[in-house]
Each structure stands twice: as C-alpha cells, then as structure tokens.
Amino acid sequence: MAMTNCLLALAIAGVVLVSLPGLSRGDGECNPSGAIRSSTTHRCQDCCKAGQSYPTYTCSPPTTGSSTDAVMTLNDFDAGGDGGGPSECDEMYHSNTELVVALSTGWYAGGSRCGKSVRINANGRSVLAKVVDECDSQRGCDEEHAYQPPCRPNVVDASQAVWDALGITGEDVGEYDITWSDA
C-alpha cells in the first residue's frame, strides 16, 4: 500500500512538472524555440546578416499584472517604414504620430490584445498606447519583416509618438528598458 501511494505521488509530481515547464525550470523565462539562418545580407543597419543564425520564440516572459519588464524598441508603422507590412490587427498602416505599439509574439497572444490599450512606464512618465501589431518572434529575415531578425520575446515595439510622450529623446531612442501592463 505504501509503495502504491509513493508511486502515485511520483506520477502526480511528474505530470505537474511536465504540465508547467516554468515550474520545472524555476525561472519563469521564455527560451528559444528554434532558429532562422539568413541566406542574404541587406543594406539596412538592423537587417539580417548572411549566414548568421537568429533565435525564434513562441513565448514571452510571463506578465506580472501591475508591471512587466520589457525592452521598448522604435518602430516605423508608416507605409514603406521599417515595420514591414500593414499592422496585423487591422491590416492598416499607422502614422508615427499615433500612440501605437506591437507586442512580441507571446504577449500579442494570437491577437487577443488587438485594439486594447497598454500602459507603458519609463523615464518617470506613463503613457497609454493601442496594440495594433505583432512584433513577430517566430519569423524574420524576409521581405514581409523588412529583412529584420525575429523579434526578441520581451519587446514592446513603439511608434515615435510613444517615445515622445515618455520624453525619451536623442541617443536614448532605439532601445529603452520599460515596464508595461494591460490598461
């Protein structure tokens, strides 16, 4: 009887650990799910380089309710900009004067945040921005993605208007540590 109970307890523990990989790792982080190797180099500064491998992700770090750590990057949502094609949520381009963002694949959550506002905190300020696109963490290095690598799993890709509203200017524009939450 004791042996049966012990085996049952081990089986349950195994199921829990397999079902909740974040608990078995103990870090709650998002690990790469694969990689893309670029076959060509393009002229833009941030474009993929031939022969280089870029990690892909199907996840993002877990959101923590009131504030989730992220890296804000600058995106051009206008037609012809470095954001690639039209926004995933509405198949439209957006002016960079609009307070809009794209979220990494895991946070984009299959479009469940489309049209919703997120609160971004940085530089002692806070701003609300509308989610209009996915910053694709699974694909990249192609024309659809403006030949840029896949998005890292912890990115909030923001329009110039978001940067301006947060008072982030000059050499700080490009990448900036922020926190964000659903509004």
From Swiss-Prot:
Protein species of origin: Oryza sativa subsp. japonica (Rice)
Pfam family, one: KWL1
SUPFAM superfamilies tied to this protein: Barwin-like endoglucanases
GO cellular component, one term: extracellular region
CDD domains documented for this protein: DPBB_kiwellin-like (cd22270)
Organism ancestry: Eukaryota, Viridiplantae, Streptophyta, Embryophyta, Tracheophyta
Family, per entry: Belongs to the kiwellin family.
Origin superkingdom: Eukaryota
Keyword vocabulary terms for this entry: Secreted, Signal
Protein name listed in UniProt: Putative ripening-related protein 1
